[in-house]
Amino acid sequence: MQFSSLSLVFLAVIGAIANPIAVDSELENRDVQLSKYGGECNLKTNACRYTKGGKSVFVPCGTAANKRCKSDRHHCEYDEHHKRVDCQTPV
């Protein structure tokens, strides 16, 4: 009787160790969300300017017609996690 109850407890512990709580993926998702920066487009230089840590950072937008800045001071977004800039984001 004791052997069967101990074996059930042992199996439950092994299952908990084998399937850890998905905290790492939640932290990774949070990091991805925190790595997005909003900024403004500069039509003359075709670059997105955003502020990171109190400093202005310039990232060039794409050269294709659907990747360029729409207008001066248009909202743009830089995703530092994926290293992508979106100069066509809707306001």
From Swiss-Prot:
One of its GO terms (biological process) is killing of cells of another organism. Its main location: secreted. Disulfide bonds join C41-C69, C48-C76, C61-C87. Residues 1-18 form the signal peptide. The keyword Protease does not apply. Antifungal protein; part of the gene cluster that mediates the biosynthesis of oxopyrrolidines, polyketide-amino acid hybrid compounds with feature structures of tetramic acid. Acts as an inhibitor of growth of various molds and yeasts. Belongs to the antifungal protein pafB family. This is Antifungal protein opdH. The lineage of its organism: Eukaryota, Fungi, Dikarya, Ascomycota, Pezizomycotina. The gene is opdH.
